[in-house]
Amino acid sequence: MSENHDAIVTDAKTEETDGCPVAHGRAPHPTQGGGNRQWWPERLNLKILAKNPAVANPLGEEFDYAEAFEALDLAAVKRDIAEVLTTSQDWWPADFGNYGPLMIRMAWHSAGTYRISDGRGGAGAGQQRFAPLNSWPDNGNLDKARRLLWPVKKKYGQNLSWADLLVLTGNVALETMGFETFGFAGGRADVWEAEEDVYWGPETTWLDDRRYTGDRELENPLGAVQMGLIYVNPEGPNGNPDPIAAARDIRETFRRMAMNDEETVALIAGGHTFGKTHGAGPADAVGDDPEAAAMEQQGLGWKSTHGTGKGGDAITSGLEVTWTSTPTQWGNGFFKNLFEFEYELEQSPAGANQWVAKDAPEIIPDAHDPAKKHRPRMLTTDLSLRLDPIYGPISRRFYENPEEFADAFARAWFKLTHRDMGPKSLYLGPEVPEETLIWQDPLPEPEGEVIDAEDVATLKTKLLESGLSVSQLVTTAWASASTFRGSDKRGGANGARIRLEPQRGWEVNEPDELAQVLRVLEGVQREFNSGSGAKKVSLADLIVLGGSAAVEKAAKEAGFPVEVPFAAGRVDATEEHTDAESFEALEPTADGFRNYLGKGNRLPAEFLLLDRANLLTLSAPEMTVLVGGLRVLGAGHQQSQLGVFTRTPGSLTNDFFVNLLDLGTTWKSTSEDRTTFEGRDAATGEVKWAGSRADLVFGSNAELRALAEVYASDDAGEKFVHDFVAAWVKVMNLDRFDLA
């Protein structure tokens, strides 16, 4: 056998990229990513419902990262990190003798992939270690930053995740350069595989921008202007050095990361108080990114042939800018230079558009030669902070009030690096700030004693006698709980925010119907609480309990009595502690579990169902059994008959699967856009059922059909009920971190 493995891989890559892998070359081996997708690229990718399987975790299922992290001496860890920051290594020399600015960029870019629309991205799992993020153009040379930290990671092992280490190092860098941070929370457990469930954009080449339509309208859920960038192009839109146009891009991308105008200015100015950019030579001198680099480079990429390829010869963005005269010390130098000089356009040694101060003295130190000085320079996006009519006054105020600027940056940095961690109750370590912030979706303390099992039984009876139907109780509980997103741990039933704006007005929640149900539930709550002494039931608990009681009733009617596990202890959030604007991002534009499809969706309903199931952390069997159960319980949007493949709605039977797979039914599209279908009796032609793409996919997709066959079998009635209950309880408790 040949030992020239790299040649084999290269040949396979070449043949694959020549065109069609079947007609003009060899299909890739499964170990190279080959498989069914190359033949049927439009097929559902159910693998996103099997993320991070236990078998892939080398630490084992019993490993408790929270417990391991709490055993750390965090102060000792920080001392070790601080030593790394000022110990320059010959293989990658530190700018100004300090790796702090590099580490700030590393932490920023780890967290900065977060976007509000689906909660994906962010620093929470240390994904910067894996493709595609480890090889994004905007993450150039951050592979060196992580490699510099290996001695620290090696020393503390599994007590300190990479995900926590990246963020903590950013904090230590700021602190050792004279900045007082807002705090730090640990708790980000590592994963062991690259995320395959994040849509980063439609482009197939780096730095392309096919994500825009109309008047520069950025596609949802994306949070960056070009493929492979964290936010914006620092040269301006598509390299056009227009600070005003760049400000528009900045505002939109930072908004999609949950930052307002003040936070945006503080973050950019605070980050650019430190360090420099790198563009010492032409881009074509830079080699392959880490994923494409040769094996002997051992995961390091962007090897440069310009000069020494490092230090003063380093190339990253192609820009060559140092913002302040004290690039390793916190201060107000960024704003001072921004406002005190006028700037003219120039090209960096790499040919990138940047700005240099006109008629300015050479006051900026060189990163590697103490004998050299430079004039102040700025990026196009830096000038946006001065010239934009909204950013400009904010920047001026921060310049004139440095303490206000420092506080704004500290808070914005903390938000940036902790936004995807979920509620404050998940924060770990001695540096967790005492102050509770509204973006953490805070919940109040319980108003009374928690209800017990006897109270639960009493309330179930009252709920079932309240006049609300099984469909109404189930739909309301689902609407409340299914807002949860495993991506950033937001949403869920705890807090009963379904009764607050904006959720009570969402189209998917049928506002008029919801208002009627909530009035009845609030009546049950008042009656119970007025006569229960110290014990109080929250509306949040009552909503979930109502759904669970309805499921029990439906299961009994199907002939399989079951008790749905219920854990009391939820509380009701207040408007004061609910950022209504931030919750607008959680509004579903589609929910296949309720057969709801809003307007403007790019993907067909079955793909949107899969995406929703992924956010709910469901497996493919859980998604399947929930859809089948919710259909027969009548939980469709606006009482739609789509997918109600049963003659006994309200009874928890497996009829959805039995009738979908009935060989005596033929299906035909009933809409031009092929979103709805009718099923007719093959013998008589009589219309029997109506369904959506989110229904028929369980018969058309081979893998989902295999699951549907399990539940359609003659012996599956009881299993179906028990599996539905288990999946139902999982969704109801997704945000009950206190139960873990």
Curated annotation (Swiss-Prot):
User: So what does this thing catalyse?
Assistant: H2O2 + AH2 = A + 2 H2O; 2 H2O2 = O2 + 2 H2O
Gene Ontology annotations for the cellular component aspect, listed alphabetically? cytosol
The entry's active site is 109 (proton acceptor)
Q: Which PROSITE patterns match?
A: PEROXIDASE_1 (PS00435), PEROXIDASE_2 (PS00436), PEROXIDASE_4 (PS50873)
An example GO biological process term is: cellular response to hydrogen peroxide
Q: Where is the composition biased (Basic and acidic residues)?
A: 1-16
Q: Which UniProt keywords apply?
A: Heme, Hydrogen peroxide, Iron, Metal-binding, Oxidoreductase, Peroxidase
Disordered, as annotated region: 1-38
User: According to its UniProt record, which cofactors does this protein need?
Assistant: heme b
Gene3D superfamilies per the UniProt record, alphabetical:
1.10.520.10, Peroxidase, domain 2
For the cross-link Tryptophyl-tyrosyl-methioninium (Tyr-Met) (with W-108), what are the residue positions?
231-257
How cofactor binds (record note)? Binds 1 heme b (iron(II)-protoporphyrin IX) group per dimer.
InterPro entries found in the cross-reference section: Catalase_peroxidase, Haem_peroxidase, Haem_peroxidase_sf, Peroxidases_AS, Peroxidases_heam-ligand_BS
Is Metal-binding one of the keywords UniProt gives this record?
A: yes
Q: Has keyword Kinase?
A: no
Name the site position(s) for Transition state stabilizer. 105
Name the Gene Ontology molecular function terms of this record: catalase activity; heme binding; metal ion binding
The record's listing under Pfam families reads: peroxidase (PF00141)
PTM remark: Formation of the three residue Trp-Tyr-Met cross-link is important for the catalase, but not the peroxidase activity of the enzyme.
Q: Location of the Tryptophyl-tyrosyl-methioninium (Trp-Tyr) (with M-257) covalent cross-link?
A: 108-231
Q: What EC class does the entry list?
A: oxidoreductase
Subunit (UniProt): Homodimer.
Q: What does this protein do?
A: Bifunctional enzyme with both catalase and broad-spectrum peroxidase activity.
**What's this protein's family per the entry?**
Belongs to the peroxidase family. Peroxidase/catalase subfamily.
Indicate what this protein is called per its UniProt record.
Catalase-peroxidase
Organism listed in the record: Streptomyces coelicolor (strain ATCC BAA-471 / A3(2) / M145)
Q: Which gene encodes it?
A: katG
